[in-house]
Amino acid sequence: MASLAAACRVSARLAARKLQHDAAVRGFRSSAAALAAQNFMMPALSPTMTEGNIASWRVKEGERFSAGDVLLEIETDKATMDVEAQEDGILMKIIQPDGSKGVQVGTRIAVVAEEGDDITKLEIPPDEGPQQLKAAAPAPAPTPAPAPASPQPQFAAPTPSPPKASTKVPARKYPLLPSVHQLIKENGLDESAVSNITPTGPGGRILKGDVLAYLGKINPNTPAQISARFEKASHLDLSNVKVAKPVEPEKPQEEKASAPAPAPRAPEPPAKAVVSLPISLSAVLEAQQRINKKLGIFLPLSTFISRATELANEELPLPTNYQPTADELFDQVLGLDKVPGYVSAAKQRATRGNYVPDIKAPIPPKAAPKPKQKKIDIIDILAAAPKAKSVKPAGPSLVPGAVTEGLNVFSLQVPKTEERRAKVFLERVKHVLENEPGRLVL
């Protein structure tokens, strides 16, 4: 008995190992074997594709293929494209051979089986392509009348009505839209019925409303009314627009003569300020004499003063009412005003002055009365010896109102906002004329 139990355990182990081996060899399947072949339809390689040509089959009948393998080549009016397999399988039978032309999308072109199926025991499924739908389209089954309580009105019979003899449907220039193609397929309309549908879309396109009106599911006049409304709204109608009459401006009421309007007040002139500073020209006279002795060149005082004025007008402070320009505001946004040594062109022009001082000598003190001259006797003149004439040397050329000895008053009359600016100018003129006159020679 012990040996029999041991033998049973060994047999059970061997059976379990055999089952595990078979499962490992066969592998895991997401779907069971169908034991029936499947139709392979003509695919739509683009949204507007309706038919194509089969150039060649890459897989022959009875051959196996894997996911990603190229099954066949399809030619369209635009290009030749490969059709790849989405999963493993077997090509059981080719319905549309190489060189087939005008194969409609959705037509059966082959029969395939799943991997591991025995194709010798499988049956070919019936064709469910659009050809059967076309055959059944000429004789559609009558639809029963709706119940009286139905809220949807029936505008026409649901069966397609033949076109009127007087209505001429234009030839279709564009392919059907995907939504229109799906609606035609669902209602089983063939090509002859589609050619009788009156298009109301832009460029002669067939819309879904045209198909529904042809089938009698909506009012037949609705698509045309909608198309006419869109056509009218696409153009601006100005036929009813009337030009308004120009409105004359109202005349102001005449004012009474007893109360005349006050005269407009003239703007007040800006306040003025007088800035003055005493300056000595002694150092300038000494420099003038040295140049005359050493170089034999005589420079008048006006030259020294004009050069000193030119130097003093450079880089003056800005007026207190100075407004920055647009360029300066933009430079501030960029942070250029904080860059050391950066001065905008507008600020350079603003810091340049154009002052010309007014020079006056101080009023001298009241002169002492001159002694009375002695009465000249004619005898003394005749008896006196003749005197030699003395020639006075030419004196220095002076600026009108300036004196060579003492102090001269340099003054400016400027707006109140430039008072500080004028003081800086006069201080610079004073410094150059009294301390650095030689700087004005070059």
Swiss-Prot record:
InterPro entries: 2-oxoA_DH_lipoyl-BS, Biotin_lipoyl, E2/Pdx1, E3-bd_dom_sf, PSBD, Single_hybrid_motif. The modification N6-lipoyllysine is found at K78. Residues 152-169 have a biased composition (Low complexity). The record marks F330 as: E2-binding in a hydrophobic pocket in the E2 core. Keywords: Lipoyl, Mitochondrion, Pyruvate, Transit peptide. One of its GO terms (cellular component) is pyruvate dehydrogenase complex. Residues 119-169, 244-269 are annotated as: Disordered. The keyword Mitochondrion applies. Residues 37-113 form the Lipoyl-binding domain. Residues 317-336 are annotated as: Interaction to the E2 core. SUPFAM superfamilies: Peripheral subunit-binding domain of 2-oxo acid dehydrogenase complex (SSF47005), Single hybrid motif (SSF51230). Residues 175-215 form the Peripheral subunit-binding (PSBD) domain. Residues 1-35 form a transit peptide. Residues 139-151 have a biased composition (Pro residues). One of its GO terms (molecular function) is dihydrolipoyllysine-residue acetyltransferase activity. Residues 245-257 have a biased composition (Basic and acidic residues). It is found in: Mitochondrion. One of its GO terms (biological process) is pyruvate decarboxylation to acetyl-CoA. The sequence organization of E3BP is highly similar to E2, having an N-terminal lipoyl-binding domain (LD), a central peripheral subunit binding domain (PSBD), and the C-terminal core region connected by disordered linkers. E3BP is bound in a tripod-like manner and the interaction to the E2 core is primarily mediated by a loop region of E3BP (residues Pro-317 to Leu-336). Eukaryotic pyruvate dehydrogenase (PDH) complexes are organized as a core consisting of the oligomeric dihydrolipoamide acetyl-transferase (E2), around which are arranged multiple copies of pyruvate dehydrogenase (E1), dihydrolipoamide dehydrogenase (E3) and protein X (E3BP) bound by non-covalent bonds. The Chaetomium thermophilum PDH complex contains 60 E2 units, 12 E3BP units, about 20 E1 units, and 12 or more E3 units. The units are organized in 1 E2 60-mer, 4 E3BP trimers, about 20 E1 tetramers, and a maximum of 12 E3 dimers. The 10-megadalton pyruvate dehydrogenase complex contains multiple copies of three enzymatic components: pyruvate dehydrogenase (E1), dihydrolipoamide acetyltransferase (E2) and lipoamide dehydrogenase (E3) and catalyzes the overall oxidative decarboxylation of pyruvate to form acetyl-CoA and CO(2). E3BP is responsible for tethering E3 in proximity to the core, forming the entire metabolon, and the number of E3s is limited by the number of E3BPs. Belongs to the 2-oxoacid dehydrogenase family. This is Pyruvate dehydrogenase complex protein X component, mitochondrial. The lineage of its organism: Eukaryota, Fungi, Dikarya, Ascomycota, Pezizomycotina.
